[in-house]
């Protein structure tokens, strides 16, 4: 498929107890953490479906593990094309996604995770505009990683470093410098990984947040999980 302007690729995992949001356990059970992730994913996909319409992007949902594609496709908005992630680790899977999108003709590629609920349409617009001059755009998270990546072309080696550490941003920036990329770093956001992140989410509660993640907030309210965060 040819891409006229660009592509948004959402990276997602199957919401399996014991394999997602494990840093929330305790105080939550693995089942509660998995359901919270499922709600986050639902909210992020619904919001992203609106964003890609406004920004004229193609929407791709890259799923891990590959055998979960059918399950996730049944609950994903119809705007998304669901594909399996390919690669032995997250960095290789991200590199694969960028290569595939660019091979299809994408001039700009955005990658986002499925646990950063405050990435809204304006953040994505800012990233796309930054790619007019920058080769790489990153939106940092509070834990040393990032929740949004923008690229104009594949860059070998960019993500070839450990991805589950507090130095992910620094490592990616170092690889970008070696490759001679022009980099733009956006204002930081945060992702939901720990009880402290949930407490921050409650502090930031607002009409904007309610629009971005209604199912997540409803689950936290219904189960009174705020009290254990």
Residue ranges and their predicted role:
Residues 110-112:
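Short aromatic-hydrophobic micro-motifs that form the base-stacking/packing surface
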Residues 171-229:
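Conserved alpha/beta core of the MobA/IspD/sugar-nucleotide pyrophosphorylase nucleotidyltransferase superfamily
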Residues 71-108, 165-168:
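Short phosphate-binding loop-to-helix
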Residues 1-23:
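N-terminal nucleotide-binding beta1-loop-alpha1 segment
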Residues 118-143:
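Conserved donor-nucleotide/metal-binding helix-loop-beta segment in metal-dependent transferases, i.e.
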Residues 156-175:
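Short, glycine-/small-residue-rich phosphate/pyrophosphate-handling segment
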Residues 57-65:
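Short beta-strand/loop segment that forms part of the nucleotide-sugar
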Residues 37-55:
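A short, N-terminal amphipathic alpha-helix
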